[in-house]
């Protein structure tokens, strides 16, 4: 079965409730049928002119962004934030991570098309003039960080003097990852589906105030006592975790070596960023995960342990709310989720499988297959409300190119037909509600070489503009492929 066969099913298998459908008025234009090909067509003179026009448009769009801007995820992660950050980084002096840890997987491509999968290092690293900051709100796994740096250096990407790690950032140890797995086993039926990268336990250590910070590595005389407290606490909490004196000795010796290597990177990043702002330097904040995984606003407890929404920028970098300007929300043209938790527009049938294959929806961090479904407008409106986005980046529009019809989840209703006005915090309600869908026509043509919005098929434009109309936020960037150049500026 091909993606083109993905049309309305008279009895589709959706994750929750039963869908209602209403058809959006069809387009009155002849539809062109062009077979999609993995090969990029030869660039013609007209395409060259289009590329020049797109370049001019992009400079104007990016140049108008605020001194301190941010790129945040609108859904449950994996929206393609890294690509936009990589593109925008060329116009910013600093790119900063403010929260999360190695559970964030950002995939970017250099000008030669080489793929880089980053987890801790900000996506601006491929731009040689950009300074990359790992802020105080991030939890840092040093073996993982050094592995990323070594991988970048071996591929010709210079990191020396370009990566700054906050002295206030908390360290994530290997035992945090072990404890993360034990915690998931304890949860049994309420399995959250974490990446098991130790993020939750590391933030837990931070909150109960026995965590160890990057700056503590400058005082190796007190590290053994602090590590002993951390490891003893974990052993008392988890029966499956065995703590021995030998483990402590090995960790101390390892972190003595790490401390020496990390020293050139350690910085008071709060001072650095605020001083840079006062010098009129431009700062781009790169969010990890996404709003619907926020510890406060997400589908709790099926969330991450930090704040990937706008509020996390200030607390994770130590900057005032008044200096934060334009925030760009990144949203897929459909919806995906990794791990457990409510997913109102999830398609559990063949349609979800086909979207997964067409979009290559497998996690950057875990490799797990992502759950797939239609774009959830209710969740997107909630995300826009929480963050106050100035604009949106709609990604992976090309994945939908082979569909006859496309659905938008536009409203929620209770089982008795009562409307649900906003994305609810009540998990039981989320499990039981029904989704109302609008059905729009597909465009059935390859859009991967399009670079001007006006050259998109009318049905594709209608899809984009209907999303804008429903959420009330303009879409300024449209992704139509993985490469740097596969972006339309609207």
From Swiss-Prot:
<keyword id="KW-0436">Ligase</keyword>
<keyword id="KW-0342">GTP-binding</keyword>
<keyword id="KW-0809">Transit peptide</keyword>
<dbReference type="GO" id="GO:0048046">
    <property type="term" value="C:apoplast"/>
</dbReference>
<dbReference type="InterPro" id="IPR042109">
    <property type="entry name" value="Adenylosuccinate_synth_dom1"/>
</dbReference>
<dbReference type="GO" id="GO:0005525">
    <property type="term" value="F:GTP binding"/>
</dbReference>
<feature type="active site" description="Proton acceptor">
    <location>
        <position position="78"/>
    </location>
</feature>
<keyword id="KW-0460">Magnesium</keyword>
<dbReference type="GO" id="GO:0009570">
    <property type="term" value="C:chloroplast stroma"/>
</dbReference>
<comment type="function">
    <text>Plays an important role in the de novo pathway and in the salvage pathway of purine nucleotide biosynthesis. Catalyzes the first committed step in the biosynthesis of AMP from IMP.</text>
</comment>
<feature type="binding site">
    <location>
        <position position="105"/>
    </location>
    <ligand>
        <name>Mg(2+)</name>
    </ligand>
</feature>
<dbReference type="InterPro" id="IPR033128">
    <property type="entry name" value="Adenylosuccin_syn_Lys_AS"/>
</dbReference>
<feature type="binding site" description="in other chain">
    <location>
        <begin position="103"/>
        <end position="106"/>
    </location>
    <ligand>
        <name>IMP</name>
    </ligand>
</feature>
<comment type="similarity">
    <text>Belongs to the adenylosuccinate synthetase family.</text>
</comment>
<protein>
    <recommendedName>
        <fullName>Adenylosuccinate synthetase, chloroplastic</fullName>
        <ecNumber>6.3.4.4</ecNumber>
    </recommendedName>
</protein>
<feature type="active site" description="Proton donor">
    <location>
        <position position="106"/>
    </location>
</feature>
<feature type="binding site" description="in other chain">
    <location>
        <position position="289"/>
    </location>
    <ligand>
        <name>IMP</name>
    </ligand>
</feature>
<feature type="modified residue" description="N-acetylserine">
    <location>
        <position position="46"/>
    </location>
</feature>
<comment type="pathway">
    <text>Purine metabolism; AMP biosynthesis via de novo pathway; AMP from IMP: step 1/2.</text>
</comment>
<feature type="binding site">
    <location>
        <begin position="364"/>
        <end position="370"/>
    </location>
    <ligand>
        <name>substrate</name>
    </ligand>
</feature>
<dbReference type="InterPro" id="IPR001114">
    <property type="entry name" value="Adenylosuccinate_synthetase"/>
</dbReference>
<keyword id="KW-0479">Metal-binding</keyword>
<feature type="binding site" description="in other chain">
    <location>
        <position position="368"/>
    </location>
    <ligand>
        <name>IMP</name>
    </ligand>
</feature>
<keyword id="KW-0658">Purine biosynthesis</keyword>
<keyword id="KW-0547">Nucleotide-binding</keyword>
<dbReference type="GO" id="GO:0004019">
    <property type="term" value="F:adenylosuccinate synthase activity"/>
</dbReference>
<dbReference type="InterPro" id="IPR042111">
    <property type="entry name" value="Adenylosuccinate_synth_dom3"/>
</dbReference>
<dbReference type="InterPro" id="IPR018220">
    <property type="entry name" value="Adenylosuccin_syn_GTP-bd"/>
</dbReference>
<dbReference type="InterPro" id="IPR027417">
    <property type="entry name" value="P-loop_NTPase"/>
</dbReference>
<dbReference type="Pfam" id="PF00709">
    <property type="entry name" value="Adenylsucc_synt"/>
</dbReference>
<feature type="binding site">
    <location>
        <position position="78"/>
    </location>
    <ligand>
        <name>Mg(2+)</name>
    </ligand>
</feature>
<feature type="binding site" description="in other chain">
    <location>
        <position position="195"/>
    </location>
    <ligand>
        <name>IMP</name>
    </ligand>
</feature>
<feature type="binding site">
    <location>
        <position position="209"/>
    </location>
    <ligand>
        <name>IMP</name>
    </ligand>
</feature>
<dbReference type="GO" id="GO:0000287">
    <property type="term" value="F:magnesium ion binding"/>
</dbReference>
<dbReference type="GO" id="GO:0044208">
    <property type="term" value="P:'de novo' AMP biosynthetic process"/>
</dbReference>
<keyword id="KW-0150">Chloroplast</keyword>
<feature type="transit peptide" description="Chloroplast">
    <location>
        <begin position="1"/>
        <end position="45"/>
    </location>
</feature>
<dbReference type="GO" id="GO:0009536">
    <property type="term" value="C:plastid"/>
</dbReference>
<feature type="binding site">
    <location>
        <begin position="105"/>
        <end position="107"/>
    </location>
    <ligand>
        <name>GTP</name>
    </ligand>
</feature>
<keyword id="KW-0934">Plastid</keyword>
<feature type="binding site" description="in other chain">
    <location>
        <begin position="78"/>
        <end position="81"/>
    </location>
    <ligand>
        <name>IMP</name>
    </ligand>
</feature>
<dbReference type="InterPro" id="IPR042110">
    <property type="entry name" value="Adenylosuccinate_synth_dom2"/>
</dbReference>
């Amino acid at each position: 079965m091909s993606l083109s066969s993905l049309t309305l099913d008279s009895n589709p298998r959706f994750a929750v409730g039963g869908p209602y459908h209403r058809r959006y008025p069809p387009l009155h234009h002849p539809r062109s049928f062009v077979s999609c090909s993995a090969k990029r067509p030869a660039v013609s003179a007209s395409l060259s002119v289009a590329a020049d026009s797109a370049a001019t448009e992009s400079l104007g769009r990016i140049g108008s962004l605020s001194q301190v801007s941010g790129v945040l995820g609108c859904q449950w992660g994996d929206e393609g934030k890294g690509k936009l950050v990589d593109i925008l980084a060329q116009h910013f002096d600093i790119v900063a991570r403010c929260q999360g840890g190695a559970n964030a997987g950002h995939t970017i491509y250099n000008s030669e098309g080489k793929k880089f999968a980053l987890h801790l290092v900000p996506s601006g690293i491929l731009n040689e003039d950009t300074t990359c900051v790992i802020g105080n709100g991030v939890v840092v796994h040093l073996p993982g960080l050094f592995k990323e740096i070594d991988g970048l250096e071996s591929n010709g990407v210079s990191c020396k003097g370009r990566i700054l790690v906050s002295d206030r950032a908390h360290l994530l140890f290997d035992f945090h990852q072990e404890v993360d797995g034990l915690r998931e086993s304890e949860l049994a039926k309420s399995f959250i589906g974490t990446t098991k990268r130790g993020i939750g336990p590391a933030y837990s250590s931070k909150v109960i105030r026995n965590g160890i910070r990057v700056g503590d590595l400058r005082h190796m005389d007190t590290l053994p006592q602090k590590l002993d407290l951390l490891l003893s606490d974990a052993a008392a909490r988890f029966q499956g975790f065995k703590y021995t004196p030998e483990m402590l000795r090995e960790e101390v010796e390892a972190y003595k070596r790490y401390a020496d290597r990390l020293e050139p990177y350690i910085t008071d990043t709060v001072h650095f960023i605020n001083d840079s702002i006062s010098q009129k330097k431009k700062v781009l904040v790169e969010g990890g995960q996404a709003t619907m995984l926020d510890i406060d606003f997400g589908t709790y407890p099926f969330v991450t342990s930090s704040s990937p929404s706008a509020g996390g920028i200030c607390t994770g970098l130590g900057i005032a709310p008044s200096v934060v300007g334009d925030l760009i929300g990144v949203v897929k043209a459909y919806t995906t989720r990794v791990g457990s938790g409510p997913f109102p527009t999830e398609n559990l049938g063949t349609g979800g499988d086909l979207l997964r294959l067409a979009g290559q929806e497998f996690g950057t961090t875990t490799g797990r297959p992502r759950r797939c479904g239609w774009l959830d407008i209710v969740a997107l409106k909630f995300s826009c409300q929480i963050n106050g986005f100035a604009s949106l980046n709609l990604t992976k529009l090309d994945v939908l190119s082979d569909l006859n019809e496309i659905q938008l989840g536009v409203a929620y209703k209770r089982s008795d037909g009562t409307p649900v006005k906003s994305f609810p915090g009540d998990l039981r309600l989320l499990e039981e509600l029904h989704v109302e869908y609008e059905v729009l026509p597909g465009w059935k043509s390859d859009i991967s070489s399009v670079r001007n919005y006006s050259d998109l098929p009318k049905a594709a434009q209608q899809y984009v503009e209907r999303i804008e109309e429903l959420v009330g936020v303009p879409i300024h960037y449209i992704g139509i492929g993985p490469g740097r150049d596969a972006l339309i500026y609207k």
